[in-house]
UniProtKB/Swiss-Prot annotation:
Keyword Kinase: no
Any Gene Ontology CC annotation: extracellular region
Keywords on record: Amidation, Hormone, Secreted
Any matching Pfam family: CRF
Residues bearing the modification Isoleucine amide: 46
Protein name: Diuretic hormone
SMART domains attached to this UniProt entry: CRF (SM00039)
Family under the similarity heading: Belongs to the sauvagine/corticotropin-releasing factor/urotensin I family.
PROSITE patterns: CRF (PS00511)
Domain of life: Eukaryota
Keyword Secreted: yes
Places the protein is found: Secreted
Amino acid sequence: TGAQSLSIVAPLDVLRQRLMNELNRRRMRELQGSRIQQNRQLLTSI
């Protein structure tokens, strides 16, 4: 039973890590996107 529970837990940990990585990537992309938009607004307002 120990081996079975381990085989179930390991993939879950991998999935969780992938989810966290994906969320972080999206967050960084959104931050960069908003920064670019702010720069564009600054350029157009000048």
